[in-house]
Structure formats: C-alpha cells, structure tokens
C-alpha cells in the first residue's frame, strides 16, 4: 500500500445514524412516507442526489420532488454533520498513516462542504478530499475512487480503500483497489462483504495490522 483512501460516513465518523434520522424525518414530514430498514439500507453509501432521485422514482404518487428534497436534505445535514463523532480507531489510524508519510484521501458520497466541515471540526490531517458530487455516477460505480486516484496520480492497485458499506466495497473493487471492509456492526451481513480483501471489526484492527507489518520491515 502506498496510498490510503477512506470513505467518510459510517467509516471515519459515526454519521449513519445522523443521515438516517434526517432522511427518514424528511420523508415522513414532507411526504408521509416511513422508510423501512431494507429500503434505507439499499441507499446506504450512495450520494444524496441518488437517494433523492430514488425517492422521487419510488414515491412519485406522493409528489416527491427530487430537487426540493435534495435542497432540504443538504440544508439540514450541513448543520447536523459535525454532531457525528469519530469512529473507534479513526483518529489513531489516520494520525499514524500521516506520521508514516502515507498520502491520505477521503473519497465520500457526501458533498464537499460536508467533508471539509468534518475534516476541520475533527482536525484531521487530510488534505485531498473527493466528493461523489464531482462525478456523474455514485457508488457502487467506481467513479469517485477513480477520481481520487487521478487526484494523487496513483496506480489504483497501489491504493488501499477502507469502506463500511457494500456499495462502497463494490465501487472500490471495480476501481481495481485493495479493499478493507469495516462493516456496520449493528447490521452485519458478512456474505455481502466477501469480495473485500479484508474484513476488520474496527479501525483499531487496521492500525494493529499496519503497525505489525511496519515492525517486521524495520
């Protein structure tokens, strides 16, 4: 591994509950729709635009407008996103990689403003930020990871990606990158993550693995 690429929501920060609360509340308050577990999981890891377009398609009979829903969603999340704490091991892993001079990238489906707010709020030493809004297709399409590799002039095969969602793992593998899955422990579905190169319980596991490898090469 020469480059480290991280998803953000649910991987670096525990924001999935925040996203879920805001998305479900908007659909319920604006359109009287109660999103089920499977339905919300289907959109996990996808962009905000993809979620809103999906809702407009599924609930056209309720008058769901993708553009209006997206505007309301982004307004609420711009305020709520920094409420999400770092995931266990996130700071330690990122700081260690930074100390080892490993280039670090965030490649997230979230808007760039959200990513910047999180990096600033938590003082993370990450300067290359790639948003899914910069590419035409969202995860599970590999576009956001392909863009990340281009931003740092990296061979995709030399990049290691950390992802918590099935859509993200599929996208990273399609980009030709090595993938470590850190699944959401509240909803474990190990068979869906079988295409990942590794499955870790948390980012502390990843840190321990990398430190052990580093010690063997010294």
Segments from the language model and where they lie:
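Asp-based, Mg2+/Mn2+-dependent phosphohydrolase catalytic module
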Residues: 1-2, 95-98, 111-218
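Short, flexible loop segments at the rims of nucleotide/cofactor-binding pockets, characterized by
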Residues: 81-85, 107, 176-179
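Conserved catalytic-core motifs of eukaryotic protein kinase domains, centered on the activation segment
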Residues: 17, 108, 117
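N-terminal helical cap/lid subdomain that shapes the substrate entry/recognition surface
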Residues: 1-92, 96-100
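Conserved phosphate-coupling serine/threonine residues in phosphotransfer and NTP-handling enzymes
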Residues: 11, 108-110
């Amino acid at each position: 591994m020469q480059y480290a690429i991280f998803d953000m929501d649910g991987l670096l920060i525990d924001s999935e509950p925040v996203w879920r609360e805001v998305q479900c509340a908007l659909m319920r308050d604006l359109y009287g729709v109660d999103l089920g577990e499977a339905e919300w999981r289907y959109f996990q890891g996808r962009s905000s635009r993809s979620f809103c377009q999906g809702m407009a398609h599924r609930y056209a009979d309720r008058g769901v407008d993708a553009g209006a829903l997206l505007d309301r969603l982004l307004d609420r999340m711009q305020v709520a996103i920094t409420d999400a704490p770092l995931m266990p091991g996130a700071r330690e892993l990122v700081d260690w990689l930074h100390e080892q001079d490993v280039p670090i990238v965030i490649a997230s489906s979230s808007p760039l403003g959200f990513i910047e707010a999180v990096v600033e709020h938590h003082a993370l030493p990450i300067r290359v930020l790639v948003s899914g809004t910069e590419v035409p297709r969202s995860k599970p399409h590999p576009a956001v990871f392909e863009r990340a590799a281009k931003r740092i002039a990296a061979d995709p095969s030399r990049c290691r990606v950390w992802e918590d969602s099935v859509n993200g793992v599929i996208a990273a593998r399609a980009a030709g990158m090595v993938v470590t899955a850190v699944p959401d422990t509240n909803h474990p579905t190990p068979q869906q993550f079988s295409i990942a190169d590794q499955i870790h319980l948390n980012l502390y596991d990843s840190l321990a693995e990398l430190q052990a490898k580093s010690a063997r090469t010294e």
